[in-house]
Amino acid sequence: MKITLKKLLILAIVPFLYACSSDRANYDDVFAKDTHGLDLLTGQFSQNIDQIWGVNELLVASRKDYVKYNDSYYTRSHISFDEGMITIETLADVNRLHSAIVHTLLMGSDAKGIDLFASGDTPISSRPFLVGQVVNNFGQSITNVNVANNFATYLIQNKLQQRRLNNGRTVQFVSIQMIANHVNIRARKYLPFVRKASRQYGIDESLILGIMQTESSFNPYAISYANAIGLMQVVPHSAGRDIFKMKGRSGQPSKSYLFDPAKNVDAGTSYLWLLRNEYLAGIQNPTSMRYAMISAYNSGAGAVLRVFSDDPDEAIYIINRMQPEQVYRILTTGHPSAQARNYLVKVDKAQRSYRRVR
């Protein structure tokens, strides 16, 4: 995800300062006192990239994009989980490129403790996250250092490309296409968590999977400028607080908590339970309820009900007088948020593709 505006970088980093604070009451004071520090932090990060890579070359991790810098920001890895493309590039020598290829191919799925804004290699894992999603030049899965080293050597010798930056520097890079069904491979990694949450909260597995695909494309490192974290993109200070309250816990989930795949799937699914059983309770038709839940997961239950009426009870009454097709049409055309309108379409389509997953 290439970003050209410094403001978006600030939006990406601010929430992590917020998420690291367990005391929301003190957040505004802390933020006010540390404005200068925040400016230094965001300014330093963007300045590092601008000075090294030049303007309009800033890459930042997002919901469906893994981005990691290393080698003092001279080398970076980018995985587009939506497009199924891995690009690893360097302004240093090919030895640094080789190392980055190996570390990227063998990175694990545990995002806890990984600072995506710092420079440094992601640790090599004995259970690489990309196994099954990428194959080498012999069509083999890349499961260990030896296989990864050999593939990295092959890529550099046979697939190395170059491009010139606006600042005159030359980038050396390789691109690796993921296999055609990489999304389904990732989805299956999380089926045990999905099935457990489905049983516990009575939420259809296909709905959980459809939301996960739409929110993160099953990227365990997923983050967003809105401070949504992890596979189901749970926002700690809003949905996260509601979830903890439901579980009888105070405060909100931490960044580390939400980067745990099992806990994230549980949190996202429990929020769907809250939407169905509390915030949207009273909607009678199961299909209409599903449409409302999906839209509310993105924009909030209040925003969904206001599409039909400013009075929540009247909104539910109106929904109950409609056919599900009418509810769907109104939510996908009448919701004031274009993102919410598109979200329902995307999740509904994705959910249909998972109804036969076993």
Curated annotation (Swiss-Prot):
Compartments where found: Cell outer membrane
E.C. numbers: 4.2.2.n1
Signal peptide: 1-19
SUPFAM superfamilies on file: Lysozyme-like
Lipid attachment locations (N-palmitoyl cysteine): 20
Catalytic reaction annotation: Exolytic cleavage of the (1->4)-beta-glycosidic linkage between N-acetylmuramic acid (MurNAc) and N-acetylglucosamine (GlcNAc) residues in peptidoglycan, from either the reducing or the non-reducing ends of the peptidoglycan chains, with concomitant formation of a 1,6-anhydrobond in the MurNAc residue
Its membrane topology: Lipid-anchor
Positions in coiled-coil regions: none
Keywords: Cell outer membrane, Cell wall biogenesis/degradation, Lipoprotein, Lyase, Membrane, Palmitate, Signal
Pfam families: Mltc_N, SLT
One GO cellular component term: cell outer membrane
GO molecular function: hydrolase activity, acting on glycosyl bonds; peptidoglycan lytic transglycosylase activity
Gene Ontology biological process: cell wall macromolecule catabolic process; cell wall organization; peptidoglycan metabolic process
Covalent lipid sites (S-diacylglycerol cysteine): 20
Physiological role: Murein-degrading enzyme. May play a role in recycling of muropeptides during cell elongation and/or cell division.
Family from the record: Belongs to the transglycosylase Slt family.
Name under which the protein is recorded: Membrane-bound lytic murein transglycosylase C
Organism of derivation: Actinobacillus succinogenes (strain ATCC 55618 / DSM 22257 / CCUG 43843 / 130Z)
Name of the gene this protein is made from: mltC
